[in-house]
């Protein structure tokens, strides 16, 4: 196999992986539309996961609390991959995480796909909890 065909194979594999991720993401979006009546964006999905992980439903959250909930979501999503671990909760019930290893260098699209992949894994492992 020459290096040209090897490079083409790698490009094809990357495209297939992205296409598979996109299809799985569309399937998740469709199930969330069915559940909530509209298509949530990535931030809304992170917010919902944050509420799920926080475990307390409130009438309203402040802007800072909403950001904290999205941070909880990201830490919870990346914990199974070894990036974070739960250290405990404070007196108000807010979870606190410790970063175990740095995030890989990624551009914005790669970061979004990285998060989407972890969100899909979360929904696979916590089916029907949102």
Language-model features: where?
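N-terminal low-complexity, intrinsically disordered segments
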Residues: 15-54
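Structural motif
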Residues: 34-42, 60-69
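Amphipathic protein-protein interaction modules
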Residues: 61-111
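Short, hydrophobic/amphipathic alpha-helical patches that form generic packing surfaces
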Residues: 44-55, 69-80, 117
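Helix-rich interaction surfaces within compact, conserved domain-sized segments
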Residues: 102-129
């Amino acid at each position: 196999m020459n290096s040209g065909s090897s490079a083409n194979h790698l490009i094809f594999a990357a495209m297939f992986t992205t296409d598979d991720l996109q299809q799985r993401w569309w399937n998740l979006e469709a199930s969330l539309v069915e559940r909530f009546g509209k298509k949530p964006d990535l931030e809304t999905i992170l917010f919902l996961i944050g509420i799920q992980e926080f475990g307390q439903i409130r009438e309203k959250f402040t802007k800072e609390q909403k950001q904290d909930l999205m941070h909880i979501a990201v830490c919870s999503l990346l914990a199974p991959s070894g990036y974070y671990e739960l250290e405990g909760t404070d007196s108000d019930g807010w979870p606190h995480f410790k970063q175990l290893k740095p995030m890989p260098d990624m551009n914005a699209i790669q970061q979004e796909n990285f998060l989407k992949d972890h969100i899909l894994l979360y929904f696979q492992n916590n089916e029907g909890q949102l």
